[in-house]
Amino acid sequence: GIFGKILGVGKKVLCGLSGMC
C-alpha cells in the first residue's frame, strides 16, 4: 500500500546515501 511505497523509497534513498546497495 501507500506505507509500503514510502518505506520502499526511504530504503532506496538510505541505500544510495550510505552506498550500501
Curated annotation (Swiss-Prot):
Would you tell me the Gene Ontology cellular component terms? extracellular region
* Compartments, as annotated in UniProt: Secreted
Q: Which InterPro entries match?
A: Nigrocin
Q: Does the keyword Ion transport apply?
A: no
Q: Where is the signal peptide?
A: none
Sorted alphabetically, the keyword list is: Amphibian defense peptide, Antibiotic, Antimicrobial, Cytolysis, Disulfide bond, Fungicide, Hemolysis, Secreted
- One Pfam family name is Antimicrobial22
Quote the tissue specificity entry.
Expressed by the skin glands.
Q: What is its main location?
A: secreted
User: What's its job?
Assistant: Has antibacterial activity against E.coli ATCC 25992 (MIC=15 uM), E.coli CIB 84492 (MIC=15 uM), S.aureus ATCC 25923 (MIC=8 uM) and S.aureus CIB 85462 (MIC=8 uM). Has antifungal activity against C.albicans (MIC=31 uM). Has hemolytic activity against rabbit erythrocytes.
State the protein's name: Nigrocin-2JDb
> What is the species of this protein?
Odorrana jingdongensis (Jingdong frog)
